[in-house]
Amino acid sequence: MIGRIWHGWTKPENADVYENLLESEIFPAIAAKGTRGYRAIQLFRRPQGHEVEFITIMWFDSWDAVKQFAGEDYERVYVPAKARGVRARFDERSQHYEIRHKLDY
């Protein structure tokens, strides 16, 4: 399993707008791509002074699935134009990690 991690920040007044955009449009559009091996996405949010930080973690079965989703330059971020307007800044590259252990209790 591979985790694709990405960070973005908004101004506090745009945080709810951005979260709604993710949930109502961007996440469904990602799922609609039909990437074989794409399993899940998680959204994390926290206030950070004059910004609000968002982290997404996407779960993929394999490196091949990550590359099917993002292309050969798989660290390149996927940022729809509509989302760029409500964010203050964002990571230009995603980080990827092999998930070695997952324990659910």
Feature names for model-found ranges:
Residues 12, 60-62, 98-101:
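Non-catalytic surface loops within mature trypsin-like serine protease
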Residues 14-40, 77-82:
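Short amphipathic alpha-helical segments
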Residues 4-8, 35, 83, 93-94:
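Residue-level signal for functionally critical sites in structured catalytic/ligand-binding pockets
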Residues 39-53, 78-105:
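Glycine-rich beta-strand-turn "strand-cap" elements at beta-sheet edges
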Residues 2-9, 40-74:
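Short, well-ordered beta-strand segments in beta-rich or mixed alpha/beta enzyme
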Residues 15-17, 65-67, 103:
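Intrinsically disordered, low-complexity acidic/polar segments
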